[in-house]
């Protein structure tokens, strides 16, 4: 058992908080975001978001004040790198250069960090190379988020991209297969996170998500998308299995199959053995079944690789990145 953190993950449609000490998830809170608070993955008002976080914390009876935050992709740059072996000082000097194709000017306006994945040794046992996850984030964005958490009554202690959060969950986890993918069925998109030999490799984004299921239900029942979302969650009048909705499931399953095949084509010596499903869409059994029928791999829940939990799987399955953000912190 280590120090307890509150993991925070802000998505396009909801904010997720998870309290974890690295071994056990003790509390989860999920709140739907007001319309317009997050647009295209970017927080529109940090003050309004801070007030929402403060309200969520109050409604859950309080959480540890040290926050581990999943930085949105719009505010960070991520790369997996293979570099010659070098000292920590040399690596810190070299990291800005590795982002030169993404940051054309003002590299000093960014903060850089990394997580080591592994080292390669030569015949004599001396280090020859190293694999790592590298991230760059704007100093202004980090300052804005630091102030946001301060206003919410929390302290920003850890900031990391979602790729590092998933690496914390899967890397070195005896319950996770080394060659696997995490499928996040989120509101606007479906994202596949691929792992190679237990290390985060790459992500693929499918531009179909829960909102498309909502739209199909809205069309069938003649309601707006917000009502359709409630119909979906409660399976009102078997809305989860209507013909129109099954068509969306099949579209998602086909695109997932294509993404898996494309990854296999680029990595002919690797076989993805399992897909761990998460996100709100993973609670839709017909959707997961459609993916399992189409993909020639084992499909299971992300709960297979999550820490033990005092809260329900229906909650933890929706916030794996928030949980992952709290793990391996200072450990």
Kindly label every feature range from the protein language model.
Residues 38, 139-168, 199-238:
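Glycine-rich phosphate-binding loop plus the immediately following alpha-helix
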């Amino acid at each position: 058992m280590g120090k307890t953190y509150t993991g925070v993950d802000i998505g396009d449609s909801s904010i997720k908080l998870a309290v974890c000490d690295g071994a056990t998830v003790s509390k989860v809170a999920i709140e739907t975001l007001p319309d317009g608070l997050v647009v295209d993955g970017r927080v529109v008002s940090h003050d309004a978001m801070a007030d929402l976080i403060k309200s969520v914390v109050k409604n859950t009876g309080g959480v540890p004040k040290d926050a581990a935050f999943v930085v949105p992709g719009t505010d960070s740059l991520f790369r997996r790198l293979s570099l010659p072996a070098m000292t920590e000082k040399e690596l810190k000097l070299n990291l800005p250069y590795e982002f030169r194709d993404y940051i054309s000017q003002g590299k000093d306006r960014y903060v850089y960090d990394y997580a080591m994945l592994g080292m390669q040794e030569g015949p004599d046992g001396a280090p020859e190379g190293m694999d790592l996850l590298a991230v760059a984030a704007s100093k202004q964005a980090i300052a804005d988020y630091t102030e946001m958490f301060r206003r919410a009554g929390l302290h920003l202690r850890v900031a990391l991209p979602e790729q590092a959060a998933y690496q914390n969950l899967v890397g070195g986890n005896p319950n996770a297969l080394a060659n696997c993918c995490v499928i996040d069925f989120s509101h606007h998109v479906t994202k596949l996170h691929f792992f190679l030999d237990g290390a985060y490799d790459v992500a693929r984004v499918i531009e179909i998500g829960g909102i498309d299921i909502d739209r199909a239900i809205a069309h069938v029942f003649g309601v707006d998308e917000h009502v359709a979302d409630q119909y979906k969650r409660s399976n009102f009048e078997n809305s989860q299995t209507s013909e129109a909705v099954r068509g969306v499931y099949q579209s998602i399953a086909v695109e997932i199959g294509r993404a898996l095949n494309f990854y296999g084509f680029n990595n002919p010596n690797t076989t993805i053995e399992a897909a761990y499903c998460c996100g709100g869409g993973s609670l839709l059994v017909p959707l997961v079944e459609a993916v399992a029928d189409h993909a020639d791999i084992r499909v299971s829940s992300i709960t297979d690789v999550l820490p033990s939990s005092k809260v329900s799987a229906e909650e933890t399955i929706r916030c794996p990145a928030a949980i992952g953000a709290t793990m391996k912190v200072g450990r």
